[in-house]
Amino acid sequence: MTDHDLMIKAFGSAPEGFSPLTSGDDSQRLQVKLGMTASVGGTTVDACCWADKTKPMQIITKALLFDPAIPDDDLRAMRESIFLVAVEVGRAT
């Protein structure tokens, strides 16, 4: 965690413009699609992750928009937080 305010909001459906993985066995895909918004120092990035049902620790990031103005440490904190939120939701389902 950095000095910046870090907020992750997870919601049950993917944001417009994102789609789940289409390769592989769809029955093995986790039903919960994780759309997330991370806000760091007033800058917002969007990410959408899917987890494999058989490997909840394997989070597949479909998109993460980086702002070059955000320091690398903050980007790392956002990726770690997104990963942790996704894993927790994956375990709960």
Name the predicted role of every residue range.
Residues 1-79, 84-93:
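Glycine-rich anion-binding surface patch
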